[in-house]
């Protein structure tokens, strides 16, 4: 959930509706994996109603690209780290320095 109370599912639902897409249409565009089939409309419905979370970073990136929502925002709403940050997150000192820098930036 974001600071303004928006959940991942709400963000997806709002953006989908703004683009005039049905759940079935959006589900058909979102691929499970690089070479996989599409997600089901029921799975999308569960995500939009916050009954399920996206199962992978790949799905989050798909939603981002299709719905024109910043990828980092969706990862934050999903409570996940993007794949490219996971290796950096394994170094506790690096995480502490990054968080301190982030806090300083917010205070400015």
Where are these regions (language model features)?
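The DNA-recognition helices of helix-turn-helix-type DNA-binding domains
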Residues: 33-34, 51, 78-82
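Interfacial/linker helices and their anchor residues that mediate assembly or domain coupling
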Residues: 78-108
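Short, solvent-exposed amphipathic helices
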Residues: 62, 73-76
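DNA major-groove recognition helix of helix-turn-helix
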Residues: 30, 48, 59, 78
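Short, basic-rich loop-to-helix N-cap that marks the start of a DNA-contacting helix
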Residues: 38, 49-65
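Short alpha-helical DNA-recognition segment
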Residues: 20-46
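A short, Lys/Arg-rich alpha-helix, primarily the initiator
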Residues: 1-21, 28
């Amino acid at each position: 959930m974001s600071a303004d109370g928006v959940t991942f599912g709400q963000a997806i639902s709002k953006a989908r509706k703004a683009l005039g897409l049905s759940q079935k249409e959006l589900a058909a565009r979102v691929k499970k994996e690089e070479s996989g089939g599409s997600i089901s409309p029921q799975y999308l419905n569960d995500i939009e109603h916050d009954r399920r979370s996206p199962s992978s970073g790949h799905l989050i990136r798909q939603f981002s690209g299709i719905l024109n929502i910043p990828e980092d925002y969706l990862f934050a709403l999903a409570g996940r780290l993007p794949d490219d940050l996971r290796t950096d997150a394994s170094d506790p000192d690096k995480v502490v320095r990054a968080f301190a820098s982030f806090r300083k930036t917010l205070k400015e």
